[in-house]
Amino acid sequence: MNLSIQEELQPFVEELQRYITPEFLEELAREMKFVKRKRKFSGSDLATICIWISQRVASDPLVRLCSRLHAVTGTVLSPEGLNKRFNEKSVLFLKHVFSLLLQQKICEQTYISNQLLSHFKRIRIMDATMFQVPHTLEHIYPGSGGCAQTAGIKIQLEYDLHSGQFFNFQVGPGKNNDKTFGTECLDTLRPGDLCIRDLGYFSLEDLDQMDQRGTYYISRLKLNTNVYVKNPSPEYFKNGAIKKQSEYIQINVIQILNQLQPGETIEYQQAYIGDKQQLFSRLVFHRLTAAQLQKRLKKIAEKEKSKHRTYSEKSKLVAGLNVYVTNAPWEWVPMEQVHELYTLRWQIEIVFKTWKSLFDIDHCRTVKQERIECHLYGKLIAIFLCSSTMFKMRQLLLQKKKKELSEYKAIGMIQDHLFLLYQSIQNTQEITKLLTRLFHLLQQNGRKSHRYEKKTVFDIMGVIYEYSGCSKQKKAA
Protein backbone atom coordinates (compact mmCIF):
# COMPACT_ATOMS: atom_id res chain seq x y z
CA MET A 1 0.00 0.00 0.00
CA ASN A 2 1.35 3.41 -1.01
CA LEU A 3 1.00 5.56 2.13
CA SER A 4 1.18 9.36 2.09
CA ILE A 5 4.09 11.18 3.75
CA GLN A 6 1.87 12.08 6.72
CA GLU A 7 0.71 8.48 7.14
CA GLU A 8 4.33 7.27 6.99
CA LEU A 9 5.34 9.79 9.65
CA GLN A 10 2.48 9.11 12.08
CA PRO A 11 3.93 6.05 13.93
CA PHE A 12 7.37 7.70 13.98
CA VAL A 13 5.94 10.85 15.59
CA GLU A 14 4.01 8.85 18.21
CA GLU A 15 7.21 7.09 19.27
CA LEU A 16 9.29 10.28 19.08
CA GLN A 17 7.08 12.33 21.41
CA ARG A 18 6.54 9.58 24.00
CA TYR A 19 9.21 10.74 26.45
CA ILE A 20 9.32 14.48 25.76
CA THR A 21 5.79 15.82 26.32
CA PRO A 22 5.40 18.26 29.27
CA GLU A 23 2.99 15.83 31.00
CA PHE A 24 5.46 12.95 30.86
CA LEU A 25 8.35 15.16 32.02
CA GLU A 26 6.32 16.48 34.98
CA GLU A 27 5.39 12.96 36.05
CA LEU A 28 9.01 11.80 35.71
CA ALA A 29 10.26 14.82 37.69
CA ARG A 30 7.97 13.85 40.59
CA GLU A 31 9.01 10.18 40.42
CA MET A 32 12.69 11.14 40.53
CA LYS A 33 12.10 13.65 43.37
CA PHE A 34 13.38 16.45 41.13
CA VAL A 35 10.10 18.21 41.98
CA LYS A 36 8.45 17.39 45.34
CA ARG A 37 5.57 19.86 45.17
CA LYS A 38 4.22 22.41 42.73
CA ARG A 39 7.06 24.85 42.13
CA LYS A 40 7.69 27.69 39.74
CA PHE A 41 10.55 25.75 38.09
CA SER A 42 9.36 22.37 36.80
CA GLY A 43 10.87 19.39 35.01
CA SER A 44 9.35 20.73 31.82
CA ASP A 45 11.06 24.11 32.40
CA LEU A 46 14.43 22.37 32.80
CA ALA A 47 13.85 20.50 29.53
CA THR A 48 12.78 23.73 27.83
CA ILE A 49 15.93 25.60 28.75
CA CYS A 50 18.39 22.73 28.22
CA ILE A 51 16.88 21.03 25.15
CA TRP A 52 14.60 23.36 23.22
CA ILE A 53 15.49 27.04 23.47
CA SER A 54 19.04 27.61 24.66
CA GLN A 55 22.05 27.16 22.47
CA ARG A 56 24.67 27.24 25.24
CA VAL A 57 23.53 26.56 28.82
CA ALA A 58 27.17 26.24 29.98
CA SER A 59 28.40 29.49 28.43
CA ASP A 60 25.53 31.99 28.03
CA PRO A 61 25.06 34.43 30.96
CA LEU A 62 22.49 33.31 33.53
CA VAL A 63 20.58 36.59 33.06
CA ARG A 64 20.12 35.74 29.38
CA LEU A 65 19.01 32.18 30.18
CA CYS A 66 16.41 33.52 32.64
CA SER A 67 15.18 35.96 30.00
CA ARG A 68 14.76 33.21 27.39
CA LEU A 69 12.96 30.96 29.85
CA HIS A 70 10.51 33.74 30.73
CA ALA A 71 9.92 34.64 27.07
CA VAL A 72 8.89 31.07 26.25
CA THR A 73 7.24 29.74 29.42
CA GLY A 74 6.43 32.79 31.56
CA THR A 75 8.51 31.35 34.42
CA VAL A 76 10.30 34.07 36.41
CA LEU A 77 13.60 33.16 38.07
CA SER A 78 16.59 35.15 39.29
CA PRO A 79 20.04 34.24 37.92
CA GLU A 80 21.00 32.89 41.35
CA GLY A 81 17.79 30.87 41.50
CA LEU A 82 18.42 29.34 38.07
CA ASN A 83 22.01 28.51 38.97
CA LYS A 84 20.76 26.61 42.04
CA ARG A 85 18.43 24.61 39.78
CA PHE A 86 21.43 23.27 37.89
CA ASN A 87 22.13 20.59 40.50
CA GLU A 88 22.75 16.87 40.80
CA LYS A 89 19.02 16.03 40.57
CA SER A 90 18.71 18.07 37.37
CA VAL A 91 21.59 16.14 35.84
CA LEU A 92 20.05 12.77 36.83
CA PHE A 93 16.69 13.86 35.41
CA LEU A 94 18.12 14.81 31.99
CA LYS A 95 20.36 11.75 31.95
CA HIS A 96 17.32 9.54 32.58
CA VAL A 97 15.33 11.17 29.75
CA PHE A 98 18.26 10.58 27.40
CA SER A 99 18.51 6.96 28.54
CA LEU A 100 14.79 6.41 27.84
CA LEU A 101 15.18 7.85 24.34
CA LEU A 102 18.12 5.53 23.62
CA GLN A 103 15.96 2.52 24.53
CA GLN A 104 13.17 3.47 22.12
CA LYS A 105 12.26 1.34 19.09
CA ILE A 106 12.21 4.45 16.95
CA CYS A 107 15.02 3.36 14.63
CA GLU A 108 13.18 0.19 13.63
CA GLN A 109 11.25 2.52 11.31
CA THR A 110 14.31 4.08 9.63
CA TYR A 111 16.07 1.17 7.87
CA ILE A 112 17.06 1.75 4.25
CA SER A 113 17.10 -1.00 1.64
CA ASN A 114 20.55 -1.78 0.21
CA GLN A 115 22.72 -4.63 -1.07
CA LEU A 116 24.79 -4.89 2.11
CA LEU A 117 21.65 -5.61 4.13
CA SER A 118 21.39 -9.04 2.50
CA HIS A 119 24.75 -9.97 4.10
CA PHE A 120 25.07 -7.74 7.16
CA LYS A 121 22.01 -7.12 9.33
CA ARG A 122 23.60 -4.12 11.02
CA ILE A 123 26.70 -2.07 10.17
CA ARG A 124 28.16 -1.01 13.51
CA ILE A 125 30.48 2.00 13.52
CA MET A 126 32.30 2.99 16.69
CA ASP A 127 34.31 6.10 17.50
CA ALA A 128 34.79 8.78 20.14
CA THR A 129 34.82 12.56 20.27
CA MET A 130 36.38 14.69 22.98
CA PHE A 131 36.25 18.30 24.10
CA GLN A 132 37.93 20.31 26.81
CA VAL A 133 36.17 21.48 29.96
CA PRO A 134 37.41 23.98 32.58
CA HIS A 135 40.59 22.82 34.35
CA THR A 136 38.71 23.11 37.66
CA LEU A 137 37.05 19.79 36.72
CA GLU A 138 40.28 17.86 36.12
CA HIS A 139 39.67 15.73 39.24
CA ILE A 140 36.31 14.58 37.77
CA TYR A 141 37.08 14.64 34.04
CA PRO A 142 40.87 14.21 33.70
CA GLY A 143 41.99 14.90 30.13
CA SER A 144 43.93 12.73 27.74
CA GLY A 145 47.17 14.64 28.21
CA GLY A 146 48.91 16.64 25.53
CA CYS A 147 49.00 20.37 25.12
CA ALA A 148 46.89 22.04 27.86
CA GLN A 149 44.35 19.18 27.94
CA THR A 150 44.17 18.86 31.73
CA ALA A 151 40.39 18.28 31.75
CA GLY A 152 38.16 16.85 29.07
CA ILE A 153 34.99 14.87 28.39
CA LYS A 154 35.06 11.93 26.00
CA ILE A 155 31.87 10.62 24.39
CA GLN A 156 31.97 7.10 22.97
CA LEU A 157 29.35 6.11 20.40
CA GLU A 158 28.51 2.99 18.42
CA TYR A 159 25.65 3.28 15.95
CA ASP A 160 24.08 1.44 13.01
CA LEU A 161 24.60 2.87 9.54
CA HIS A 162 21.50 1.08 8.20
CA SER A 163 19.03 2.68 10.62
CA GLY A 164 20.87 5.32 12.68
CA GLN A 165 20.19 3.45 15.94
CA PHE A 166 22.56 4.25 18.82
CA PHE A 167 23.73 0.87 20.21
CA ASN A 168 26.27 1.90 22.83
CA PHE A 169 26.93 5.26 24.41
CA GLN A 170 29.26 6.45 27.16
CA VAL A 171 30.12 9.83 28.64
CA GLY A 172 33.33 9.85 30.66
CA PRO A 173 36.72 11.46 31.32
CA GLY A 174 38.93 12.34 28.37
CA LYS A 175 41.58 9.86 29.53
CA ASN A 176 39.22 6.86 29.15
CA ASN A 177 40.61 4.07 26.99
CA ASP A 178 38.90 3.42 23.64
CA LYS A 179 39.85 -0.26 23.57
CA THR A 180 38.17 -0.89 26.95
CA PHE A 181 34.90 0.54 25.65
CA GLY A 182 35.12 -1.66 22.54
CA THR A 183 35.53 -4.78 24.70
CA GLU A 184 32.60 -3.79 26.94
CA CYS A 185 30.32 -3.58 23.89
CA LEU A 186 30.94 -7.18 22.74
CA ASP A 187 27.88 -8.48 24.60
CA THR A 188 25.56 -6.38 22.41
CA LEU A 189 26.75 -8.08 19.19
CA ARG A 190 24.45 -10.32 17.17
CA PRO A 191 25.24 -12.89 14.46
CA GLY A 192 25.27 -11.15 11.08
CA ASP A 193 26.48 -7.77 12.39
CA LEU A 194 29.41 -6.06 10.66
CA CYS A 195 31.72 -4.09 12.98
CA ILE A 196 33.99 -1.45 11.44
CA ARG A 197 36.74 -0.43 13.88
CA ASP A 198 39.73 1.88 13.67
CA LEU A 199 43.13 1.47 15.34
CA GLY A 200 42.02 2.96 18.67
CA TYR A 201 39.80 -0.09 19.25
CA PHE A 202 42.20 -2.68 17.83
CA SER A 203 42.32 -5.89 19.85
CA LEU A 204 43.03 -9.39 18.55
CA GLU A 205 41.05 -10.80 21.49
CA ASP A 206 37.99 -8.72 20.54
CA LEU A 207 38.22 -9.69 16.86
CA ASP A 208 38.46 -13.35 17.84
CA GLN A 209 35.38 -12.94 20.07
CA MET A 210 33.46 -11.37 17.18
CA ASP A 211 34.36 -14.29 14.94
CA GLN A 212 33.19 -16.80 17.56
CA ARG A 213 29.85 -14.95 17.90
CA GLY A 214 29.12 -15.07 14.17
CA THR A 215 29.83 -11.35 13.81
CA TYR A 216 31.88 -9.94 10.92
CA TYR A 217 34.55 -7.27 11.23
CA ILE A 218 36.74 -4.95 9.19
CA SER A 219 39.52 -3.43 11.25
CA ARG A 220 42.73 -1.55 10.66
CA LEU A 221 45.74 -3.56 11.81
CA LYS A 222 48.47 -2.08 13.98
CA LEU A 223 51.65 -2.21 11.95
CA ASN A 224 53.71 -3.46 14.89
CA THR A 225 51.61 -6.66 14.93
CA ASN A 226 53.48 -9.69 13.61
CA VAL A 227 51.75 -11.20 10.58
CA TYR A 228 52.48 -14.55 8.94
CA VAL A 229 51.35 -16.25 5.73
CA LYS A 230 51.65 -19.79 4.40
CA ASN A 231 55.18 -20.54 3.23
CA PRO A 232 55.01 -21.58 -0.45
CA SER A 233 58.26 -23.57 0.03
CA PRO A 234 58.20 -25.10 3.54
CA GLU A 235 60.79 -27.56 4.80
CA TYR A 236 59.84 -31.23 5.25
CA PHE A 237 60.97 -34.09 7.48
CA LYS A 238 62.02 -37.33 5.82
CA ASN A 239 58.59 -38.82 6.59
CA GLY A 240 56.91 -36.04 4.54
CA ALA A 241 55.60 -33.99 7.48
CA ILE A 242 56.06 -30.20 7.32
CA LYS A 243 58.56 -28.71 9.76
CA LYS A 244 56.35 -26.59 12.05
CA GLN A 245 58.69 -23.59 12.16
CA SER A 246 58.76 -23.36 8.36
CA GLU A 247 54.99 -23.63 7.75
CA TYR A 248 54.50 -19.85 7.96
CA ILE A 249 56.77 -16.96 7.05
CA GLN A 250 56.62 -13.45 8.50
CA ILE A 251 55.50 -10.63 6.21
CA ASN A 252 57.82 -7.67 5.70
CA VAL A 253 55.58 -4.58 5.60
CA ILE A 254 58.23 -2.31 4.05
CA GLN A 255 58.74 -4.84 1.27
CA ILE A 256 55.01 -4.87 0.50
CA LEU A 257 54.89 -1.06 0.53
CA ASN A 258 57.65 -0.96 -2.08
CA GLN A 259 55.90 -3.57 -4.24
CA LEU A 260 52.59 -1.69 -4.43
CA GLN A 261 51.77 1.28 -6.64
CA PRO A 262 49.86 4.22 -5.06
CA GLY A 263 46.18 3.24 -4.80
CA GLU A 264 46.94 -0.48 -5.37
CA THR A 265 45.63 -3.31 -3.15
CA ILE A 266 46.76 -6.90 -2.49
CA GLU A 267 45.37 -9.64 -0.25
CA TYR A 268 46.49 -12.72 1.68
CA GLN A 269 43.40 -14.85 2.23
CA GLN A 270 44.76 -17.08 5.01
CA ALA A 271 46.94 -14.93 7.25
CA TYR A 272 48.04 -15.81 10.73
CA ILE A 273 48.10 -12.71 12.94
CA GLY A 274 49.78 -12.19 16.30
CA ASP A 275 52.06 -14.28 18.49
CA LYS A 276 50.50 -14.79 21.94
CA GLN A 277 46.92 -14.13 20.79
CA GLN A 278 46.48 -15.74 17.37
CA LEU A 279 43.91 -14.90 14.73
CA PHE A 280 43.38 -16.43 11.31
CA SER A 281 41.91 -13.85 8.97
CA ARG A 282 41.93 -12.24 5.55
CA LEU A 283 44.67 -9.62 5.32
CA VAL A 284 44.44 -6.71 2.87
CA PHE A 285 47.19 -4.17 2.11
CA HIS A 286 46.19 -0.89 0.47
CA ARG A 287 48.78 1.73 -0.49
CA LEU A 288 47.60 5.32 -0.14
CA THR A 289 47.60 7.71 -3.06
CA ALA A 290 50.04 10.65 -2.95
CA ALA A 291 47.24 13.03 -1.86
CA GLN A 292 46.08 10.66 0.91
CA LEU A 293 49.65 10.20 2.16
CA GLN A 294 50.22 13.95 2.27
CA LYS A 295 47.06 14.38 4.35
CA ARG A 296 48.13 11.63 6.77
CA LEU A 297 51.65 13.04 7.19
CA LYS A 298 50.11 16.43 7.95
CA LYS A 299 48.05 14.81 10.74
CA ILE A 300 51.17 13.10 12.10
CA ALA A 301 52.98 16.47 12.16
CA GLU A 302 50.06 18.02 14.06
CA LYS A 303 50.10 15.17 16.61
CA GLU A 304 53.86 15.54 17.09
CA LYS A 305 53.35 19.22 17.84
CA SER A 306 50.27 19.00 20.09
CA LYS A 307 51.20 15.86 22.05
CA HIS A 308 54.97 16.46 22.14
CA ARG A 309 55.51 13.07 20.55
CA THR A 310 58.10 12.09 17.94
CA TYR A 311 57.30 9.48 15.31
CA SER A 312 60.14 7.34 13.95
CA GLU A 313 61.13 7.50 10.29
CA LYS A 314 59.86 3.93 9.87
CA SER A 315 56.44 4.94 11.25
CA LYS A 316 56.26 7.81 8.79
CA LEU A 317 57.29 5.51 5.95
CA VAL A 318 54.65 2.84 6.67
CA ALA A 319 52.05 5.59 7.13
CA GLY A 320 51.61 5.21 3.38
CA LEU A 321 50.01 1.80 3.93
CA ASN A 322 46.61 0.79 5.26
CA VAL A 323 46.44 -2.80 6.49
CA TYR A 324 43.03 -4.33 7.11
CA VAL A 325 41.91 -7.59 8.68
CA THR A 326 38.47 -8.99 7.97
CA ASN A 327 36.57 -12.24 8.35
CA ALA A 328 33.88 -11.20 5.84
CA PRO A 329 33.64 -13.86 3.09
CA TRP A 330 35.47 -12.98 -0.13
CA GLU A 331 32.26 -13.66 -2.10
CA TRP A 332 30.52 -10.86 -0.19
CA VAL A 333 33.41 -8.42 0.09
CA PRO A 334 36.09 -8.82 -2.60
CA MET A 335 39.57 -7.47 -1.92
CA GLU A 336 38.89 -4.20 -3.82
CA GLN A 337 35.88 -3.40 -1.63
CA VAL A 338 37.50 -3.87 1.80
CA HIS A 339 39.06 -0.39 1.85
CA GLU A 340 35.87 1.09 0.39
CA LEU A 341 33.69 -0.51 3.08
CA TYR A 342 36.09 0.65 5.78
CA THR A 343 35.60 4.25 4.61
CA LEU A 344 31.97 4.01 5.78
CA ARG A 345 33.45 4.50 9.25
CA TRP A 346 34.08 8.14 8.37
CA GLN A 347 30.33 8.76 8.54
CA ILE A 348 30.62 8.95 12.30
CA GLU A 349 33.03 11.87 11.84
CA ILE A 350 30.17 13.76 10.16
CA VAL A 351 27.94 12.91 13.14
CA PHE A 352 30.49 14.34 15.57
CA LYS A 353 31.05 17.38 13.35
CA THR A 354 27.35 18.29 13.69
CA TRP A 355 27.59 17.97 17.47
CA LYS A 356 30.28 20.63 17.67
CA SER A 357 29.61 22.93 14.71
CA LEU A 358 25.79 22.95 14.85
CA PHE A 359 24.91 22.11 18.47
CA ASP A 360 27.95 23.69 20.19
CA ILE A 361 28.21 20.74 22.56
CA ASP A 362 31.82 21.73 23.33
CA HIS A 363 31.02 25.34 24.34
CA CYS A 364 31.47 25.89 28.06
CA ARG A 365 32.92 28.54 30.36
CA THR A 366 34.31 28.07 33.85
CA VAL A 367 31.03 27.19 35.53
CA LYS A 368 30.09 24.50 38.03
CA GLN A 369 30.07 20.80 37.11
CA GLU A 370 26.27 20.35 37.28
CA ARG A 371 25.64 23.22 34.89
CA ILE A 372 28.06 21.77 32.35
CA GLU A 373 26.42 18.34 32.68
CA CYS A 374 22.91 19.83 32.25
CA HIS A 375 24.20 21.51 29.09
CA LEU A 376 25.75 18.23 27.91
CA TYR A 377 22.71 15.99 28.42
CA GLY A 378 20.31 18.64 27.13
CA LYS A 379 22.37 18.85 23.95
CA LEU A 380 22.54 15.05 23.64
CA ILE A 381 18.73 14.84 23.84
CA ALA A 382 18.36 17.54 21.16
CA ILE A 383 20.97 15.76 19.02
CA PHE A 384 19.15 12.44 19.39
CA LEU A 385 15.80 13.98 18.38
CA CYS A 386 17.33 15.70 15.34
CA SER A 387 19.38 12.63 14.40
CA SER A 388 16.39 10.26 14.62
CA THR A 389 14.33 12.65 12.50
CA MET A 390 17.15 12.91 9.95
CA PHE A 391 17.38 9.11 9.57
CA LYS A 392 13.59 8.90 9.13
CA MET A 393 13.74 11.62 6.47
CA ARG A 394 16.65 9.83 4.77
CA GLN A 395 14.56 6.66 4.57
CA LEU A 396 11.45 8.51 3.30
CA LEU A 397 13.34 10.54 0.70
CA LEU A 398 14.85 7.34 -0.68
CA GLN A 399 11.57 5.43 -0.53
CA LYS A 400 9.39 8.15 -2.08
CA LYS A 401 11.77 10.07 -4.33
CA LYS A 402 14.80 7.77 -4.83
CA LYS A 403 17.10 10.57 -3.58
CA GLU A 404 20.10 10.54 -1.22
CA LEU A 405 19.90 12.92 1.74
CA SER A 406 22.92 14.87 2.98
CA GLU A 407 23.19 14.07 6.70
CA TYR A 408 24.97 17.32 7.51
CA LYS A 409 22.59 19.60 5.60
CA ALA A 410 19.56 17.74 6.98
CA ILE A 411 20.64 17.93 10.64
CA GLY A 412 21.13 21.70 10.29
CA MET A 413 17.67 22.20 8.77
CA ILE A 414 16.00 19.97 11.36
CA GLN A 415 17.74 21.88 14.15
CA ASP A 416 16.32 25.12 12.71
CA HIS A 417 12.84 23.61 13.24
CA LEU A 418 13.53 22.37 16.78
CA PHE A 419 11.68 25.23 18.49
CA LEU A 420 8.65 24.68 16.22
CA LEU A 421 8.75 21.02 17.24
CA TYR A 422 8.70 22.14 20.89
CA GLN A 423 5.66 24.36 20.26
CA SER A 424 3.68 21.48 18.76
CA ILE A 425 5.03 18.68 20.98
CA GLN A 426 1.68 17.87 22.63
CA ASN A 427 -0.19 17.52 19.35
CA THR A 428 0.69 14.48 17.23
CA GLN A 429 -1.15 15.91 14.22
CA GLU A 430 0.70 19.22 14.40
CA ILE A 431 4.10 17.50 14.64
CA THR A 432 3.21 15.32 11.66
CA LYS A 433 2.27 18.43 9.63
CA LEU A 434 5.53 20.12 10.66
CA LEU A 435 7.63 17.09 9.66
CA THR A 436 5.76 16.84 6.35
CA ARG A 437 6.72 20.46 5.60
CA LEU A 438 10.26 19.64 6.64
CA PHE A 439 10.30 16.64 4.28
CA HIS A 440 9.46 18.88 1.31
CA LEU A 441 12.18 21.35 2.34
CA LEU A 442 14.76 18.56 2.58
CA GLN A 443 13.65 17.19 -0.79
CA GLN A 444 14.33 20.63 -2.27
CA ASN A 445 17.50 21.69 -0.43
CA GLY A 446 18.88 18.72 1.50
CA ARG A 447 20.07 16.35 -1.18
CA LYS A 448 23.61 15.00 -1.12
CA SER A 449 26.13 16.77 -3.36
CA HIS A 450 27.99 14.40 -5.69
CA ARG A 451 31.65 15.07 -6.38
CA TYR A 452 33.24 13.86 -9.58
CA GLU A 453 34.29 10.18 -9.36
CA LYS A 454 33.79 10.17 -5.56
CA LYS A 455 31.44 7.53 -4.19
CA THR A 456 28.82 8.47 -1.63
CA VAL A 457 27.62 6.28 1.25
CA PHE A 458 24.68 5.08 -0.84
CA ASP A 459 27.05 4.08 -3.66
CA ILE A 460 29.23 2.03 -1.31
CA MET A 461 26.22 0.39 0.37
CA GLY A 462 24.65 -0.51 -2.96
CA VAL A 463 21.51 1.59 -2.53
CA ILE A 464 19.37 2.05 -5.64
CA TYR A 465 18.77 5.78 -6.06
CA GLU A 466 18.77 8.57 -8.64
CA TYR A 467 20.26 12.00 -9.01
CA SER A 468 20.33 14.63 -11.72
CA GLY A 469 23.67 16.03 -12.72
CA CYS A 470 25.16 17.08 -16.02
CA SER A 471 21.89 16.04 -17.72
CA LYS A 472 22.17 12.40 -16.69
CA GLN A 473 20.61 10.01 -14.24
CA LYS A 474 22.67 7.68 -12.11
CA LYS A 475 21.81 4.61 -10.08
CA ALA A 476 24.10 2.93 -7.60
CA ALA A 477 24.53 -0.74 -8.45
Curated annotation (Swiss-Prot):
Statement: the UniProt record of this protein carries the keyword Iron: no
Top-level taxon in the UniProt lineage: Bacteria
Entry's Gene Ontology molecular function annotations: DNA binding; transposase activity
Protein name as annotated: Transposase for insertion sequence element IS231F
Keywords, alphabetical: DNA recombination, DNA-binding, Transposable element, Transposition
SUPFAM superfamilies in the record: Ribonuclease H-like (SSF53098)
Disulfide bonds, paired cysteine numbers: none
Family as reported in the entry's similarity comment: Belongs to the transposase 11 family.
Transmembrane segments: none
Naturally occurring in which organism (per UniProt): Bacillus thuringiensis subsp. israelensis
Pfam families documented for this protein: DDE_Tnp_1
Classification via InterPro entries: RNaseH-like_sf (IPR012337), Transpos_IS4 (IPR047952), Transposase_11 (IPR002559)
UniProt GO BP: DNA transposition
Function noted in UniProt: Involved in the transposition of the insertion sequence.
